[in-house]
């Protein structure tokens, strides 16, 4: 038996099929993964993501400490509620984890992946020496992600007028604290939506309110196909400690300026650039019948081979799609080996669908 969120019994009551995910027993779907996927693209759905790790960071050195720890620069978060995405790198530039960091009134809040919890906390503790900084894990909090074009509208209708007004005013990648609730306009689906971090003892009642308002409970299966269509990396598949942001379509998340900010991994990344980045993360589209899966070999004629990192059937495109790490010189065509046979695939930018629009 794995760890369970406070909503586990409610998930079962709603008909969830559960699976192990990073040591947690989590809902895979509540009957139909494909229906949940389409519901989020067209309306909205709610995901329990309380298995993720919330870490509050405070102290007089909180900013300079995070400026050293993260590839992105928290100095860009000039107001409480502002958020940014960042890789957390090792000395060689490999990705220990990827996370969201929010500016709070007194410091910062990090939301990291569930499966990386132990190694992230060990890394933070190791890098704490010499800094006046404190960090606290918050297992008392629940996290619900309400995602889809009607998410903000439907959630606002359930809240007090004052809290609803805060939601309507939120810009993308901004959050706001309201009492013991923190509401952010962020997500992992490629749609508009909210991620709400709030006291766990209120989780069951609020989840029931959301479902009662017609917001579909949605599982990790739909979350995975939604994020894949959106070209969002999954830690442990598309990114890990053996690959850098430069080979993972995450170069945009590195803040190189100011040049004197010597964040952990900077030297390794600069060395990779100096020697020439050898690989890139691309999207693949299979035009024939079949399913692209992780670890299938990608062959690029006259250039070399790569590997699929994530692959699945796309409910929006009605085709199989994938993310793959391939040689840098790869053009717009390649082949994938499926059960001993080679199939042609189209190579595209690794973003297939965003905000309901097909981009390929």
From Swiss-Prot:
Q: What class of enzyme is it?
A: transferase
Domain of life assignment: Bacteria
What EC number(s) does its UniProt record assign? 2.1.2.10
Q: Which UniProt keywords apply?
A: Aminotransferase, Transferase
Which terms does the record give in the GO molecular function aspect? aminomethyltransferase activity; transaminase activity
What are its GO cellular component terms?
A: cytosol; glycine cleavage complex
Keyword field contains Transferase = yes
* SUPFAM superfamilies named among the record's database cross-references: Aminomethyltransferase beta-barrel domain (SSF101790), Folate-binding domain (SSF103025)
Catalytic reactions on record = N(6)-[(R)-S(8)-aminomethyldihydrolipoyl]-L-lysyl-[protein] + (6S)-5,6,7,8-tetrahydrofolate = N(6)-[(R)-dihydrolipoyl]-L-lysyl-[protein] + (6R)-5,10-methylene-5,6,7,8-tetrahydrofolate + NH4(+)
Give the stretches traversing the membrane: none
Q: Which InterPro entries match?
A: GCS_T (IPR006223), GCS_T_bac (IPR022903), GCST_C (IPR013977), GCV_T_N (IPR006222), GcvT/YgfZ/DmdA (IPR028896), GcvT/YgfZ_C (IPR029043), TrmE/GcvT_dom1 (IPR027266)
Alphabetical GO biological process terms = glycine decarboxylation via glycine cleavage system
The task this protein performs is described as: The glycine cleavage system catalyzes the degradation of glycine.
NCBIfam families assigned to the protein according to its UniProt record, in alphabetical order = gcvT, PRK00389.1
Family affiliation: Belongs to the GcvT family.
What PANTHER family does its record include?
AMINOMETHYLTRANSFERASE, AMINOMETHYLTRANSFERASE, MITOCHONDRIAL
Which proteins does it associate with, and in what oligomeric form? The glycine cleavage system is composed of four proteins: P, T, L and H.
Q: What is this protein called?
A: Aminomethyltransferase
Organism, as annotated:
Pseudomonas putida (strain ATCC 47054 / DSM 6125 / CFBP 8728 / NCIMB 11950 / KT2440)
Give the organism's phylogenetic lineage: Bacteria, Pseudomonadati, Pseudomonadota, Gammaproteobacteria, Pseudomonadales
Gene this chain is encoded by: gcvT
